Amino acid sequence: GVELDPVSGRIARQLYQKNKIAIQGFEETDYPDSFFDCVIGNVPFGAYQISDRRYDRHHFLIHDYFIAKSLDLIRPGGVVAVVTSSGTMDKQNPAVRQYLANRAELLGAIRLPNNAFQRNANTGVVSDILFFQKRDRASIEEPDWIHLKETAEGYSVNAYFADHPEMVLGEFTTESTQYGKQEVTVRPKEGITLEEQLKEAVKHIHGTITELELSDTELEEDVVSIPADPEVKNF
């Protein structure tokens, strides 16, 4: 696991003592590509970029950067599941979504209501849970979820949510921002809990993950590996 906050990181180390918890920025980690089977996270949201020479040319906002880097870290067929800003799916410029679609299939997405994190983080932002499965090879296809689309009520949102209203855990509406601009948000439904809605929504997400088979070369490398001689100096 990776946790930037020292307190949260130490708590995680106590909770998961058999696991390695790195207390550092995600951009500072040096995990090899195609190393993990699955990456799960609640990525930071923000309208700012993070410095990483490998990704700087893409000008990713921080939440999009976390998704892109996670996809590189998992093996083909592996799954990335993240909570991210609704901006990943709803921004006007589709470049980030095209980048992700070239590398992964969107298994499904769930749009959360604007009060989902009100209790824990005192924030009313709209967020999504996205599920990606990494492709074996890069694709040039342009799936519908790359684009925006108007809902039946006339709200411009990601085509996935316009076509799958059952994955929106609330009702689309607009609200005024601090600058007086009208912004699309998701008002929570009455008479049903978020937990109940989530249980129903995840039933619509389907995917298959298989165990990675090691190649003959990788098996041979494991066989011939020997420990270093402690008497030999490492210059």
Residue locations for each model-derived region?
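Conserved Class I SAM-dependent methyltransferase catalytic core
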Residues: 2-11, 59-118, 125-132
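Flexible, glycine-/basic-rich loop-and-beta segments that form/coincide
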Residues: 119-220
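Short catalytic/ligand-binding loop motif for oxyanion handling, primarily in non-cytosolic enzymes
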Residues: 47-50, 89-92, 140
